[in-house]
Swiss-Prot record:
Belongs to the short-chain dehydrogenases/reductases (SDR) family. FabI subfamily. Transmembrane segments: none annotated. The gene is fabI. InterPro entries: Enoyl-ACP_Rdtase_NADH, NAD(P)-bd_dom_sf, SDR_fam. This is Enoyl-[acyl-carrier-protein] reductase [NADH] FabI. The record marks 201, 204-205 as: Involved in acyl-ACP binding.
Length: 262
């Protein structure tokens, strides 16, 4: 019996088998969790239904996190099958493509700034607000961040600011929901080749650099992140809340390892 047996967890953000959310769902399924999934639009519906079926789930619901009404409708529908559940994984982030290339100050726009923060950060607390009364004591909410929240990463630009907002969101949500027995955490994952990452200029160079200088001398995988996510949504991590856990092979703690390559 896995360490998530008896847990019901909603997973957002599965777009392909390369998605971090897919790796998380795989690990949670392996550990016995009962899963539900969301999809953003009809283009993704069939694909997400297929992945859900492979992971033993028939609960696949539409949700556009840009619209509060869509979030509310999704949780109302989920409540018909799961009146109570044990948490959700927020693996959602977006910025317009023109924001992710070149000099940050030149590239950023008011609209791009607003959209990045709305979709990548506000949507996390919007989902928590909408399902707060449905969460069992001992529930865990998890989101995905990146080192660009802490450091200026070339071409990551306004997404770095949105991820910094998201990490602050984690702390404030953890403090607000803790008395109800709800924990809130984030994983700051190392770069992984996903559909979302493909929109960042020179992402392949970023991967190669990380592989060369990361202490473990490899990039992390969706399986690495999935295993950590399963732990953070389980009772094994009952004392952890408000944290940003780096699953990046140690990249964020090292400096100047490139000197050893010369």
């Amino acid at each position: 019996m896995g360490f998530l047996s008896g847990k019901r967890i909603l997973v957002t953000g599965v777009a392909s088998k390369l998605s971090i959310a897919y790796g998380i769902a795989q690990a949670m399924h392996r550990e016995g969790a009962e899963l539900a999934f969301t999809y953003q639009n009809d283009k993704l519906k069939g694909r997400v239904e297929e992945f859900a079926a492979q992971l033993g789930s028939s609960i696949v619901l539409p949700c556009d996190v840009a619209e509060d009404a869509s979030i509310d409708a999704m949780f109302a529908e989920l409540g018909n099958v799961w009146p109570k559940f044990d948490g959700f994984v927020h693996s959602i982030g977006f910025a317009p493509g023109d924001q992710l290339d070149g000099d940050y100050v030149n590239a950023v726009t008011r609209e791009g700034f607003k959209v990045a923060h709305d979709i990548s950060s506000y949507s996390f607390v919007a989902m928590a607000k909408a399902c707060r009364t449905m969460l069992n004591p001992g529930s865990a909410l998890l989101t995905l961040s990146y080192l660009g929240a802490e450091r200026a990463i070339p071409n990551y630009n306004v997404m770095g600011l949105a991820k910094a907002s998201l990490e602050a969101n984690v702390r404030y949500m953890a403090n607000a929901m803790g008395p109800e027995g709800v924990r809130v955490n984030a994983i700051s994952a190392g770069p992984i080749r996903t559909l979302a990452a493909s929109g960042i200029k020179d992402f392949r160079k970023m991967l190669a650099h990380c592989e060369a200088v990361t202490p473990i001398r490899r990039t992390v995988t969706i399986e690495d992140v999935g295993n950590s996510a399963a732990f953070l949504c389980s009772d094994l991590s009952a004392g952890i809340s408000g944290e940003v856990v780096h699953v990046d092979g140690g990249f964020s703690i090292a400096a100047m390892n490139e000197l050893e390559l010369k």
